[in-house]
Amino acid sequence: MNRTMFKSKIHRATVTHADLHYVGSVTVDLDLLEAADILPGELVSIVDITNGARLETYTIAGERGSGVIGINGAAAHLMHENDLVILITYAQMTTEEAKAYEPKVVHVDQDNRIIQLGNDPAEGIAPGMTRPPFALNNAAL
């Protein structure tokens, strides 16, 4: 049996632009894609911290070092410039693979520059962010 497991995320990224009249997708700085092990064209879930919207789309590689997080097409009705978002990927794994897998977590600053890489999906490093109550860290599992 395969399980759908958390694979990677880019945490608390800032939307740099939202363009309604563009072919749908999300444009992401190639440095961020590589750090999170996300390929161009890969399915991502995007959660908007600012307004609670959620959607799925695919990635387009953006200029390396640009910090771009561009919401394209119809998704621009839901997510806007300067919104904080989380881009999340999932993968199908066997139970054995899932138990051994270490996800990629990319924390970014307000300019979408990488400030920390990790593998604990519950770790909060941004000011004011705390670990969810009762959440174990990966080392405790």
UniProtKB/Swiss-Prot annotation:
PTM annotation: Is synthesized initially as an inactive proenzyme, which is activated by self-cleavage at a specific serine bond to produce a beta-subunit with a hydroxyl group at its C-terminus and an alpha-subunit with a pyruvoyl group at its N-terminus.
Subcellular location: Cytoplasm
Enzyme class: lyase
Transmembrane segments: none
Assigned GO CC terms: cytosol
Cofactor(s) this protein cannot do without: pyruvate
One MF annotation (Gene Ontology) recorded for this entry: aspartate 1-decarboxylase activity
SUPFAM superfamilies recorded: ADC-like
Catalytic activity, reaction form: L-aspartate + H(+) = beta-alanine + CO2
Function: Catalyzes the pyruvoyl-dependent decarboxylation of aspartate to produce beta-alanine.
Protein name per the record: Aspartate 1-decarboxylase
Gene: panD
